Amino acid sequence: MKTLLLTLVVVTIVCLDLGYTMTCCNQQSSQPKTTTNCAESSCYKKTWSDHRGTRIERGCGCPQVKRGIKLECCHTNECNN
């Protein structure tokens, strides 16, 4: 009986994938695509303009931004590319 219970617990953990992390893009502006694994459940893409032109920042989570910065948050892997 204990063996059956232990087997069910292991199968449940494997099926639920309790260690799931989200994959978000983290390259800046027009740099080559890079990704990172995140503990957060969302990715973001911030866009703004300055004296160098349009700037883009990508990363994990969904931060608050200042006025004049466009923020897009999403909830699937690499959705912020």
Swiss-Prot record:
KW Transcription (keyword) present: no
Main location, first listed in the record: secreted
GO CC field: extracellular region
Signal peptide feature range: 1-21
Compartments where found: Secreted
Domain of life assignment: Eukaryota
One function term, GO molecular function aspect: acetylcholine receptor inhibitor activity
Disulphide-bonded residues: C24-C43, C38-C60, C62-C73, C74-C79
Keywords carried by this UniProt record: Acetylcholine receptor inhibiting toxin, Disulfide bond, Ion channel impairing toxin, Neurotoxin, Postsynaptic neurotoxin, Secreted, Signal, Toxin
SUPFAM superfamilies, per database record: Snake toxin-like
Keyword Disulfide bond: yes
Tissues expressing this chain: Expressed by the venom gland.
Function, as annotated: Binds to muscle nicotinic acetylcholine receptor (nAChR) and inhibit acetylcholine from binding to the receptor, thereby impairing neuromuscular transmission.
UniProt family annotation: Belongs to the three-finger toxin family. Short-chain subfamily. Type I alpha-neurotoxin sub-subfamily.
Protein name per UniProt: Short neurotoxin SN160
Organism name: Hydrophis hardwickii (Hardwick's spine-bellied seasnake)
